[in-house]
């Protein structure tokens, strides 16, 4: 292949600019499978990116606030999806124009990063990204230094985050937790109260999952279980491709404190599971080489439901976690310290549970088959260790183990009249649950976007090194008004008027209640936002926006023109 290519290249050089040279060059490019690139520079590059950012943000921002609208998304299969979830809308958007798509993809990156860190705030992050990047493009076009703008933006964000932390207040009561959940669920009180009840049942550190219900109503079910902070070792173990999870019903559980590398030991355990016609979960330090290959081949070719998960923790903490798991599931830890090895595993050494759900990040074990008395004794041992420990780190790890062992798992079963309704409600419940966890973690600030609005006033005092940095600070100052403006506009009110009224007065708890069309004390009215959500949305939006503002060239692939299908030959004996 390479000799042929070299020969063609030589012919191309000899042919000069002739038609033959062009043909040979074309054949050479084809032989190496090159994809042609298009390069955009400066103002043109940023303008095209901005169009992608604006169109995506405009589709997302209509969902913001209690009077935000739904977005209907066509799907390649099944019924259209109806949602008010910002990150779902953002993920569904692709543009034909490659450069526009670069801008849209970077906004998706902001939404995904905010969603991964805080679990909510994706719409706010998207709206802020558009506002910052729009002003940044104008400033660069006017001759400002892009790097100084970026420094000014960074300084302003740091100052705002410090100000927000000063506003924050911690929450503890069930009523406050319900308020946070209600706001994030677009004002649906029932969802907020359901989340508050779930946290009461399993504790703030407990595990709460969301599932489809079988009725028209939302239900709360608490199941004794444990969550491990490790996911599947290989994606080949996935059984539910839509959810990207491995789900095992009534599995046997092998628990080992060392690496599993021996293929023969794995085959023996697989035979036990096959004989009992049950799935198999392996929890070990690691599963490598032949052993992992054997499991994957049996999963793909023989259809045996199996999954391997790395044991959570390190050192002594890992051993303790495995012992907790063994007691919860009624099994034993296969450990060489007690003279045990995988070759001598017997069926009674394997644990069991009702269901296991494994994602790429974690494993939830529901309704373990362990003895209740043994589980309670183990929990008492951990409580005693917490009381006697003098190390804050050890106490934290012990309390985590106690929550996993005795807290159980709360399952929020979401009901509805149709699959589309259940899907839309699940999106809102997921947002509400994530926001509630964030609020418990870092505290709350007045909601409805007013925390960012009032923080913008403090930027007047910020000192900068030069004029361009000052413009960067002003970009953030203007962007911080956007969430309140958008929420008011979606409620059918003039956003600029609402922003102006709030900035004129001095009460930082006063805000605009879009649901009731009135100005209220946001905290007393229960309209609150988790600090973590607001902080993450601002930091992520500013980071990506300032990167886009300093972009000077974009390289994208030129789409290949597909050759038309060959014409069908005529059939003999037919007249046309």
Curated annotation (Swiss-Prot):
GO terms for biological process: protein folding; protein refolding. GO terms for cellular component: mitochondrion. Keywords: ATP-binding, Chaperone, Mitochondrion, Nucleotide-binding, Stress response, Transit peptide. It is found in: Mitochondrion. InterPro entries: Chaperonin_Cpn60_CS (IPR018370), Cpn60/GroEL (IPR001844), Cpn60/GroEL/TCP-1 (IPR002423), GroEL-like_apical_dom_sf (IPR027409), GROEL-like_equatorial_sf (IPR027413), TCP-1-like_intermed_sf (IPR027410). Disulfide bonds: none annotated. HAMAP family: CH60 (MF_00600). Belongs to the chaperonin (HSP60) family. This is Chaperonin CPN60-2, mitochondrial. The lineage of its organism: Eukaryota, Viridiplantae, Streptophyta, Embryophyta, Tracheophyta.
């Amino acid at each position: 292949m390479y000799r042929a290519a070299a020969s063609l290249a030589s012919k191309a050089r000899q042919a000069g600019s002739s038609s033959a040279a062009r043909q040979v060059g074309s054949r050479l490019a084809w032989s190496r499978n090159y994809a042609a690139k298009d390069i955009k520079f400066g103002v043109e590059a940023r303008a095209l990116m901005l169009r992608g950012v604006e169109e995506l943000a405009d589709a997302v921002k209509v969902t913001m606030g209690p009077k935000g609208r739904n977005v209907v998304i066509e799907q390649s299969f099944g019924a259209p999806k109806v949602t008010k979830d910002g990150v779902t809308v953002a993920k569904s958007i692709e543009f034909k124009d490659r450069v526009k798509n670069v801008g849209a993809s970077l906004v998706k990156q902001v939404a995904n990063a905010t969603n991964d860190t805080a679990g909510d705030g994706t719409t706010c992050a998207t709206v802020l990204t558009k506002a910052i990047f729009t002003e940044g493009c104008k400033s660069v076009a006017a001759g400002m230094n892009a790097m100084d703008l970026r420094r000014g933006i960074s300084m302003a964000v740091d100052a705002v985050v410090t100000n927000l932390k000063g506003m924050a207040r911690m929450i503890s009561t069930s009523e406050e937790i319900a308020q946070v959940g209600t706001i994030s669920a677009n004002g649906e009180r029932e969802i907020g109260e359901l989340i508050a009840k779930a946290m009461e049942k399993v504790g703030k550190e407990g595990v709460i999952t969301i599932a489809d219900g079988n009725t028209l109503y939302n239900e709360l079910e608490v199941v004794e279980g444990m969550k491990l902070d490790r996911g599947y070792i290989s994606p080949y173990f996935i059984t539910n491709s839509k959810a990207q999870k491995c789900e095992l019903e009534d599995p046997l559980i092998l628990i080992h404190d060392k690496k599993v590398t021996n293929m023969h030991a794995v085959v023996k355990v697989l035979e036990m599971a096959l004989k009992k016609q049950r799935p198999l979960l392996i929890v070990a330090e690691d599963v490598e080489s032949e052993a992992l290959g054997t499991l994957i081949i049996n999963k793909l070719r023989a259809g045996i439901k199996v999954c391997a998960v790395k044991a959570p923790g390190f050192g002594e903490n890992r051993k303790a976690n495995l012992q907790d798991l063994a007691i919860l599931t009624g099994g034993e830890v296969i450990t060489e310290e007690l003279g045990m090895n995988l070759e001598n595993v017997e069926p009674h050494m394997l644990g069991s549970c009702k269901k296991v759900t494994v994602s790429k990040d974690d494993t939830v074990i529901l309704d373990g088959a362990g003895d209740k008395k043994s589980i309670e004794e183990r929990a008492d041992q951990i409580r005693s260790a917490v009381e006697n420990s003098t190390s804050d780190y050890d106490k934290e790890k012990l309390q985590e183990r106690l929550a996993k062992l005795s807290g159980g798992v709360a399952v929020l079963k979401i009901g509805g009249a149709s699959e589309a309704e259940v899907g839309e409600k699940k999106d809102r419940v997921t947002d509400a649950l994530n926001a509630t966890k964030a609020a418990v973690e870092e505290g709350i600030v007045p909601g409805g976007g007013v925390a960012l609005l009032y923080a913008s006033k403090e930027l007047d005092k910020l000192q900068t090194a030069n004029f361009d940095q000052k413009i960067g600070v002003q970009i953030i100052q203007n962007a911080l008004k956007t969430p309140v403006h958008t929420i008011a506009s979606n409620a059918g009110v003039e956003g600029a008027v609402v922003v102006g009224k709030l900035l004129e007065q001095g009460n930082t708890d006063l805000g605009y209640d879009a649901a009731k069309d009135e100005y209220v004390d946001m905290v007393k009215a229960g309209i609150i936002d988790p600090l973590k959500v607001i902080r993450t949305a601002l930091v992520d939006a500013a980071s990506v926006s300032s990167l886009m503002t300093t972009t000077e060239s974009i390289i994208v692939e030129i789409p290949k023109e597909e050759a038309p299908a060959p014409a069908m030959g005529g059939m003999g004996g037919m007249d046309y």
